[in-house]
Amino acid sequence: MDLPGPIRDILLVPLELGLILGGLEVVLLTNIIYSALSLGPVLVCISLLYILLNADFVAAAQILIYVGAVNVLIVFAVMLMNNQKYPNFVPLWTVGDGITLVVCTSLFCSLITIILNTSWSEISMTTKSNQILEQDLTNNVQRIGAHLSTDFFLPFELLSIILLVALVGAITIARREEIV
């Protein structure tokens, strides 16, 4: 989707806010079911960002694979877990939290330093005309489809069988029934 710069910027801000707030919900919510359910809107915001970047195929794959399959699988696995009572006392700050804070803060500061010290004007970005770019994207999508339905057909079928076995195993473990 080719949008003018100001419109793209206006759409970008709510999407990024949705990503940040949704990510915080995923991490900070204490109920694991709510946390798993709040992962869906985060993945949808990521796919909408791909649409703004003119990567329609990647956005569709993001919706189909992550939102449609992985998020449903996560919610399904969480629902099958035994509803164990967690202790009421949860420490607010642990050693692991402190280490994580130090690592994340140092990574953030190093990224900000790199971004600010990079000479962005020296990086030349050449783009093709929209017509040639759309033609290349169409050919790429057709090539991906051809590879997925011919060369990679067997690996995908094996992967689906492995996922099915993992799902049956997770259900068996969650129900804690003996196999007869």
Swiss-Prot record:
Keywords: Chloroplast, Membrane, NAD, NADP, Plastid, Plastoquinone, Quinone, Thylakoid, Translocase, Transmembrane, Transmembrane helix, Transport. It is found in: Plastid, Chloroplast thylakoid membrane. The keyword Membrane applies. GO terms for cellular component: chloroplast thylakoid membrane. The keyword Translocase applies. It catalyses: a plastoquinone + NADH + (n+1) H(+)(in) = a plastoquinol + NAD(+) + n H(+)(out); a plastoquinone + NADPH + (n+1) H(+)(in) = a plastoquinol + NADP(+) + n H(+)(out). The chain crosses the membrane at residues 10-30, 32-52, 57-77, 95-115, 153-173. It is a multi-pass membrane protein. It comes from the Eukaryota. InterPro entries: NAD(P)H-Q_Oxidoreduct_6 (IPR050290), NADH_UbQ/plastoQ_OxRdtase_su6 (IPR001457), Nuo/plastoQ_OxRdtase_6_NuoJ (IPR042106). Its EC number is 7.1.1.-. One of its GO terms (molecular function) is quinone binding. Belongs to the complex I subunit 6 family. NDH shuttles electrons from NAD(P)H:plastoquinone, via FMN and iron-sulfur (Fe-S) centers, to quinones in the photosynthetic chain and possibly in a chloroplast respiratory chain. The immediate electron acceptor for the enzyme in this species is believed to be plastoquinone. Couples the redox reaction to proton translocation, and thus conserves the redox energy in a proton gradient. NDH is composed of at least 16 different subunits, 5 of which are encoded in the nucleus. This is NAD(P)H-quinone oxidoreductase subunit 6, chloroplastic. The lineage of its organism: Eukaryota, Viridiplantae, Streptophyta, Embryophyta, Tracheophyta. The gene is ndhG.
